[in-house]
UniProtKB/Swiss-Prot annotation:
Name the record gives this protein: Large ribosomal subunit protein bL28
GO CC annotations, alphabetized: ribonucleoprotein complex; ribosome
Keyword Metal-binding included in the entry's annotation: no
Gene3D superfamilies, per database record: Ribosomal protein L28/L24
Keywords, sorted A to Z: Ribonucleoprotein, Ribosomal protein
InterPro entries found in the cross-reference section: Bacterial_rp_bL28, Ribosomal_bL28, Ribosomal_bL28/bL31-like_sf, Ribosomal_bL28_bact-type, Ribosomal_bL28_sf
Natural source organism: Sulfurihydrogenibium sp. (strain YO3AOP1)
GO molecular-function term, one example from the UniProt record: structural constituent of ribosome
GO biological process: translation
Length: 63
């Protein structure tokens, strides 16, 4: 579910590293929004889009 349907951005796994070099597992999740979008054929559909794609204008929002 946590995948941008425009660019494919998804959850990334890694470590938080303290000053003492101890590591702790963590995740970074994309800033997803569920948006109603106008498709090429004129129909509307709700899809998950990351905030970066929304700001870049890669999708046309339905009004």
């Amino acid at each position: 579910m946590a995948v941008c349907q425009i660019c494919g951005k998804k959850t990334v796994f890694g470590n938080t590293v303290a000053h003492s070099a101890t590591t702790e597992r963590r995740t970074w999740k994309p800033n997803l929004r569920r948006v109603r979008v106008v498709l090429e054929d004129g129909s509307t559909k709700r899809i998950y889009v990351c905030a970066k794609c929304l700001k870049a204008g890669k999708v046309k929002k339905a009004v």
